[in-house]
Amino acid sequence: MADFFAMPLWTDFLWPLIVMVAQSVLLLVVLLIAIAYILLADRKIWAAVQIRRGPNVVGPWGLFQSFADLLKFVLKEPIIPSGANKGVFLLAPLVSCVLALAAWAVIPVNLNWVIADINVGILYIFAISSLSIYGIIMGGWASNSKYPFLAALRSAAQMVSYEVSIGFVIITVLLCAGSLNLSAIVEAQHTSGLATLIGLPWLTFLNWYWLPLLPMFVVFYVSALAETNRPPFDLVEAESELVAGFMVEYGSTPYLLFMLGEYVAITTMCAMGAILFMGGWLPPVDLPPFNWVPGVIWFSLKLFFMFFLIAMAKAIVPRYRYDQLMRLGWKVFLPLSLAMVVIVAAVLQFAGIAPK
């Protein structure tokens, strides 16, 4: 038996595989529990803005409401429309959910706390978020109904439009950090920046990219709303126009998978905002007692702050018209983000502070 554990098959393949599977299962469990409470927080924030209490019956202060909703969805019978393509109809929500979860494989929640610390992590997330459109298009087409199909077409145009702006945001961060590795981007915000230049390196929050790249932070925030079909850009699911959008024919577990994929994608965008612009797991001030707090706590607080901004947009901003949405993406954000790429590159080059 000891000889087996010394074999290259065990040390080089089986053991790393077991560790990776265990890490993935742990991340999945933690992420799904976090999504349950993020969904509850979304409803509570919306209720507070409208001077309501929100969910408050299931468990103390409504803390178990999301788990009751899960049970309700699972116990319902899934109904497939008679004219629908059954295989594609059932595959669509699975594709949407799995792709959203796969993005978390490269997101570091603390120093060395990441499943796959690849050097192109930010491009991997960008690619995965682009692929998630296929789940929506498949669901809209397979439903064999005009409302889901129209919503799927809207979604395709909307996500393509705002991915361009997010791409330019990524380029500006790449220029400042000198790496596409998400952990390296966080570390770059620890060792260089405005606080370092003025001789106060312990003021870590001044090193974060939200300050020098503030216009791009705003572009990223608004583009994240559009990319994840959140209000005021929820034209894909506009209740007053398309009933429930591409999900109108779905119920039971398939509908739950679509909703889960949507909220995981929102959480991914919040995590990206925390990593790219707010220093990831870094404390705002690198002095006691702030640096005594575990990095994963700081990361979680920043993620929830980003989600709070997204939830408030749902509560206070009216929905855009479709032409306004397209005009904002192509005529405002695209020129602005392109100009910022040129400005950031020029400043870094001529000031002599470009990363080596």
Curated annotation (Swiss-Prot):
The chain crosses the membrane at residues 18-38, 87-107, 120-140, 166-186, 202-222, 257-277, 292-312, 333-353. It comes from Nitrobacter winogradskyi (strain ATCC 25391 / DSM 10237 / CIP 104748 / NCIMB 11846 / Nb-255). The gene is nuoH. It is found in: Cell inner membrane. Keywords: Cell inner membrane, Cell membrane, Membrane, NAD, Quinone, Translocase, Transmembrane, Transmembrane helix, Ubiquinone. This is NADH-quinone oxidoreductase subunit H. NDH-1 shuttles electrons from NADH, via FMN and iron-sulfur (Fe-S) centers, to quinones in the respiratory chain. The immediate electron acceptor for the enzyme in this species is believed to be ubiquinone. Couples the redox reaction to proton translocation (for every two electrons transferred, four hydrogen ions are translocated across the cytoplasmic membrane), and thus conserves the redox energy in a proton gradient. This subunit may bind ubiquinone. It catalyses: a quinone + NADH + 5 H(+)(in) = a quinol + NAD(+) + 4 H(+)(out). Belongs to the complex I subunit 1 family. HAMAP family: NDH1_NuoH (MF_01350).
